[in-house]
Amino acid sequence: MQTKLTQFFKKNTLDKSTTDFQKNETNIEQNNNIQKKTITIYTDGACKNNGKKNAIAGIGVYSENVYNISEKIEGRQTNQRAELYAILKALELTKIDDYSTVYIYTDSLYSINCITKWIYGWINNGWLDKKKKPVKNKDIIQPIYNIYKKYSNIRFIHIEAHTNKTDIHSLGNAKADELATLFNSAINKVV
């Protein structure tokens, strides 16, 4: 009798339902250990006739296989506003929770400093700069900062502009620049 029971259990230990359960258990473990992916986004702003009344500013946002944006900015038309607006647009369109890290590459050290350094002094001073004047571009800086402080997975990385290098980040920056200037070129051709 003992031999028959042993043979029965050996034969039926891995029946279909047991095998299915083991597969499902493995899937659950794998699902619990899924690592989120990262995303790399390149942003750029461009302004033709910067500082003049006839200035036209546009943005370029490039992220391979996710989205590419080329559009004119609203309001005052300056290069710095365009650089900031490109970052804001990228953050607004990205489902930040879907990624372990969101890398924003920009050639605008001004934009990075606004969001990661200078803003703390501005907030403490009631959004006044060192000369006690209202901070320029607050309307764009503040919403970027609000997104930045909400998520701990956003990283800003400064990259050199117009290098003609062929590494992946230089090429990504060139694509963002092309999108920003493409928009300006299209406007100028229509006018």
Predicted regions and their residues:
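RNase H catalytic domain
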Residues: 46-52, 88-174
